[in-house]
């Protein structure tokens, strides 16, 4: 029970990581017309979750958890470097690195433990968000599959929240989209919690290009 509550707290909208400031390119997708209602939002989120950063982040989270559990500092540093390198644009790099550092700092202060202190000492500088979450969960002994599932659901929730602010999608429709994607998150977590870095890969080229376009978008409220 305590592990589930810990994950809920760490990945809640109130956790001080600044998730509200990022849309992962969704703001540009709305601007260019790719996302214009609940149906197109669901399609866009499904692609990101199953073929883009959602899937990759869940794998990276699992890898970080595994490295901490094995006390493999070199692998932990290497997987963080890889996670940062996979960010396709400056804004998406900022999105993951700012949230990652904020998450680890907040968790180390509020939920300190010797293993997490060791992790923090190894991961100085830029830190990818899924690495921070996986490493913290591994340090606290939280189950890997539950961690990956919770991370994946929070990823989708944050983007649905962003959509409510920039897309013609109401709260009821947004909640329905989230509900429709929850079984996919669970299915992915069941598989990806055991995956390694060889399973990484994405096919969301339009989103990646959109994240570049967002840097010069005329009117915007998000940092990505």
From Swiss-Prot:
Natural source organism: Methylorubrum populi (strain ATCC BAA-705 / NCIMB 13946 / BJ001) (Methylobacterium populi)
InterPro entries in the record: UreF, UreF_sf
Identification of the protein by name: Urease accessory protein UreF
Gene: ureF
Subunit organization: UreD, UreF and UreG form a complex that acts as a GTP-hydrolysis-dependent molecular chaperone, activating the urease apoprotein by helping to assemble the nickel containing metallocenter of UreC. The UreE protein probably delivers the nickel.
Keywords for this protein: Chaperone, Cytoplasm, Nickel insertion
Chief location: cytoplasm
GO cellular component terms given for this protein: cytoplasm
Function: Required for maturation of urease via the functional incorporation of the urease nickel metallocenter.
GO molecular function: nickel cation binding
Family annotation (Gene3D superfamilies): Urease accessory protein UreF
Family: Belongs to the UreF family.
Subcellular localization, as worded in the UniProt entry: Cytoplasm
